[in-house]
Each structure stands twice: as structure tokens, then as C-alpha cells.
């Protein structure tokens, strides 16, 4: 701002100097002309020429040259004053005295405001007549306070008997804020309820207190109202539960991710589990054994049960893989379905490795060739072990317990209850020909569901297994058939 003022001051000074130089030049030319006596009547012309600006008498009129000279002199004086004032401000700014600058501005502002005319304030409803307010009938002047800033401001009362303290301007810290709150609580006015007016005299008792019958009637009415009143929260809870039940919103058990523990195991191929089990169910229809007892002439279901029971004992004795057991039983049933086998050759079919040289190698090779030829070399099938392993994962949510159960299942040990129930029911299904000829996944689902009934996790297990089985599968009847007896039967 000072820079611009300095520039404008210099320009005004230059203009004044230019005007002064022009006036001097004009006066010099005028004196030269008058000396040559070419304009002898110039003064007369000036006196007779009318002045368009000022209507003064002839003796008070000034010539144009004189006016230009005065204007030039005033402009030069003004430019000199402005230049001097700018120099003073520049010296003050260079000295760094900020207080003097502020005081200088205030002085200039006061001088400017003092030059303004004091216009009387005109209030609505009180017009001015010759600069005076009109008075009302009572002779009082209508004075109205001007409206200020309308806000949520509360005026602080002044200090009585002393000087007004300046306002506190300090940052509000935690301690200062706590102090302000404490002072506000101390200065808070008491509640209206605390200021009780003392009784002037003894109150008269109500009519019910003086009448015993009326008092008993009031007590009986209050008791009935209390008995009819119920908690609002209980009513709202019941209504919410009823509305959820009507809309079909029920708190269903959480579906467990049974493959979560195998996400880091690349051999488990968790990404393809759903596709694999869908493929197993499709292939199961082709490799499922069919009822063949009406084809066989020399054997019955009891003889088959004795054979499979002996095979189970050999399996446990040599600690073979459980999947090998299921595959062996499947091969036996499929072979008996396509060919009638005499009684003397029945035990050769699956016990070739445990006969202890009871049969010759030629007989073993002949029987092996006959089995593979009749089955068309179709031996790779999804056995019960695949579905049993899946349902065990769905039955046990604890990863540590699941790891132990997997090891027990692979080692064919029956120490835990889940493996005992599953092994018992699964072994019973392969012993009974009518049950073994059903779907493998149905049989293993039944065995897993039986153990969950005993452990109390049936509902959660059903929700988890829904995506692993067909929705229309109903196996409760088979569960009771499996768990009805205490040991394996041969019927």
C-alpha cells in the first residue's frame, strides 16, 4: 500500500511541477508581447470578459493567467506535502516501529472522522422537522435503541465497586476447562424443587384417609392396576420374535467351512473339492453294486456276511488301509453280480494274500483274470472311504480333534467315539448285502448322522452337509435301523 501511495504522490508532484512550469512560460510570453506593445488593450479585454465560474463584481475578478498561476502554486505545494508525508512514512517503516504506524493511522482516521458532519440519527416513527425530533403527547422524546448483532450472546455483568476486568484471552487446555466446569457447577442456581416453601400450618387429611372403606377401595384398585401392567420390554421381545417367525427369519446354525484347515495343503486341492464330489456322485451310479442273491445258486446272505466278517478281522490284524477294504468288498459284490460262483471258490476271491499257501499260484492267477475280465478292468471307483472322510470333516469343528480323527481313520483305530460309531455302522453296512447295495454317500451320511445325534450337533451338521448331499435324501429311518442292535448281525 505504501508503495502505491509513493507512486501516486510522485505523480501529483510531477503534475504540479508541470503546471507551475507552464504558467511561468505563459507569463513570460505575456510580458514579451506587452513589451512590444502589440496587445495594449489586453487588460481592457480581460476586464470586459465575463467570468463563467464566479459572478463577482468587476473589481474582484481575476484574470485567467492569475488563476492558472494560483492553481500551479497549489498543485506544487500539495505535491511537496505528499512527497514529504511519504518520506516520513517510509522512514517509519524502515525503522520498524509498528506501534508508531498504528498510532499514525489512528490519528489520520480520527482527523477524517472529525471532518464529517454529525448527522442526527433518525428513529422510525420520529421524523425530523428542522433537525428536531417530534415529541409525543407527554412531552417525552421517542428514543429507540439501535439493533446490534443478533446472536446467542449473554452480556457479562460488570464488577461492582471496582474496575472492569479485561476479558481472559488464553487457550482452553484440559486443566483450564476442568476449572471452568467446576466454577460453573458452584455458581449454578438451585433447582426449583429444592426451594420448598415451609408449611404454614397442618394440612387437612384427605377424605380417603379419614374414611377406612374408601382407603381400602383405593388400595384394591391400585393392586389390580399393578397386576394388569406388564413390562414393555417383554411384550416388545415377544412381538419381534413372532414377526420374525411369521416372515421366516429364524436363527439358523452357522454353516462351517470344513475345508478351511486344508487351504494351505496343495495336495488336498481345496479349489476343486466341489467338482470332485459332484463327479464322485455321478460315477457312483455306474459302480454301485446291485442285488445278486437271486442269481447265486450255492450261496446266500449269511455266507457273504461270514466272508466279509472274516475279511474285517484280517484287515484289522494286518492294519491295512481302510480304502482297500471298501474297494475289495465292492469288487466282490460286482463280480458276484455278473457271475455265479460255486461255494468252494468263494473264499478264493478276496483272501488270496492271507491263505498262507492254501491255494496254488495258478489258481490265484486264474481267479484274478476271471475277476478283471468280468469287471472289464473297471476298478477305480469312489468308495465309502471318500464320503466317510468328508462327513467326518463336517462332523468335527475343532481342527486339533479333526487331525486326530483323520489319523485314526487312516490307521483304522477306533479309540474315539465318532470313529467307533462310524466304523461300527460302516462295517455293518458292508456286512449286510441289502445295505451295501445302496448309495455309498447315503450309508456314510447315515453313520455320521448317528454320531452327531449322540453328540447333540445334529442341526449344525445338517446345515453344513446340505451342500454335500442331495436335498431329497432322507435317512432317519436307516439311522434307527443301524443303531437298533448292539453288534453286527448277519441277517
Swiss-Prot record:
It holds the Pfam family Cyclin_N. Keywords: Cell cycle, Cell division, Cyclin. The keyword Cell cycle applies. Expressed in roots, stems and flowers. InterPro entries: Cyclin, Cyclin-like_sf, Cyclin_N, Cyclins_cyclin-box. Belongs to the cyclin family. Cyclin AB subfamily. This is Cyclin-B1-5.
Amino acid at each position: 500500500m505504501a508503495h502505491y501511495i509513493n507512486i501516486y504522490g510522485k505523480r501529483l508532484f510531477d503534475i504540479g511541477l508541470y503546471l507551475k512550469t507552464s504558467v511561468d512560460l505563459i507569463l513570460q510570453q505575456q510580458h514579451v508581447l506587452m513589451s512590444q506593445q502589440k496587445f495594449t488593450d489586453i487588460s481592457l479585454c480581460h476586464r470586459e470578459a465575463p467570468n463563467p465560474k464566479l459572478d463577482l463584481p468587476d473589481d474582484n475578478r481575476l484574470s485567467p493567467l492569475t488563476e492558472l498561476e494560483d492553481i500551479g502554486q497549489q498543485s506544487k505545494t500539495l505535491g511537496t506535502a505528499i512527497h514529504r508525508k511519504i518520506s516520513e512514512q517510509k522512514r517509519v517503516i524502515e525503522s520498524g516501529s509498528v506501534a508508531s504506524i498504528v498510532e499514525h493511522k489512528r490519528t489520520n482516521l480520527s482527523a477524517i472522522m472529525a471532518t464529517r458532519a454529525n448527522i442526527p440519527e433518525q428513529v422510525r416513527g420520529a421524523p425530523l422537522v428542522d433537525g428536531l425530533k417530534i415529541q409525543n403527547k407527554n412531552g417525552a422524546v421517542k428514543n429507540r435503541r439501535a439493533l446490534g448483532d443478533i446472536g446467542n450472546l449473554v452480556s457479562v455483568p460488570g464488577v461492582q465497586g471496582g474496575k472492569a476486568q479485561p476479558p481472559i484471552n488464553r487457550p482452553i487446555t484440559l486443566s483450564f476447562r476442568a476449572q471452568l466446569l467446576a466454577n460453573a457447577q458452584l455458581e449454578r442456581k438451585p433447582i426449583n424443587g429444592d426451594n420448598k416453601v415451609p408449611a404454614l400450618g397442618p394440612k387437612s387429611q384427605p377424605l380417603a384417609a379419614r374414611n377406612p372403606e374408601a382407603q381400602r377401595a383405593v388400595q384394591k384398585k391400585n393392586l389390580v392396576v399393578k397386576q394388569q401392567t406388564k413390562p414393555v420390554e417383554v411384550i416388545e421381545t415377544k412381538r419381534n420374535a413372532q414377526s420374525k417367525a411369521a416372515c421366516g427369519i429364524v436363527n439358523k446354525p452357522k454353516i462351517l467351512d470344513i475345508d478351511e484347515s486344508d487351504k494351505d495343503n496343495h495336495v488336498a486341492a481345496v479349489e476343486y473339492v466341489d467338482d470332485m464330489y459332484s463327479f464322485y456322485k455321478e460315477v457312483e451310479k455306474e459302480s454301485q453294486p446291485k442285488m445278486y442273491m437271486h442269481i447265486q445258486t450255492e450261496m446266500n446272505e449269511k455266507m457273504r456276511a461270514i466272508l466279509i466278517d472274516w475279511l474285517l478281522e484280517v484287515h484289522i490284524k494286518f492294519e491295512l488301509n481302510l480304502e482297500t477294504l471298501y474297494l475289495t468288498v465292492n469288487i466282490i459284490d460286482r463280480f458276484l453280480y455278473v457271475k455265479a460262483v460255486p461255494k468252494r471258490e468263494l473264499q478264493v476271491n478276496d483272501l488270496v494274500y492271507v491263505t498262507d499257501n492254501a491255494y496254488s499260484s495258478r489258481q490265484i492267477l486264474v481267479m484274478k483274470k476271471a475277476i478283471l475280465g468280468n469287471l472289464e478292468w473297471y476298478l477305480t471307483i469312489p468308495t465309502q472311504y471318500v464320503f466317510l472322510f468328508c462327513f467326518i470333516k463336517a462332523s468335527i469343528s475343532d481342527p486339533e480333534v479333526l487331525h486326530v480323527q483323520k489319523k485314526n481313520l487312516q490307521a483304522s483305530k477306533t479309540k474315539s467315539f465318532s470313529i467307533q460309531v462310524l466304523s461300527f455302522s460302516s462295517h455293518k453296512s458292508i456286512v449286510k448285502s441289502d445295505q451295501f447295495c445302496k448309495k455309498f454317500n447315503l450309508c456314510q451320511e447315515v453313520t455320521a448322522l448317528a454320531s452327531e445325534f449322540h453328540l447333540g450337533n445334529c442341526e449344525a451338521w445338517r446345515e453344513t452337509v446340505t451342500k454335500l448331499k442331495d436335498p431329497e435324501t432322507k435317512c432317519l429311518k436307516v439311522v434307527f435301523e443301524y443303531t437298533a442292535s448292539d453288534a453286527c448281525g448277519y441277517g
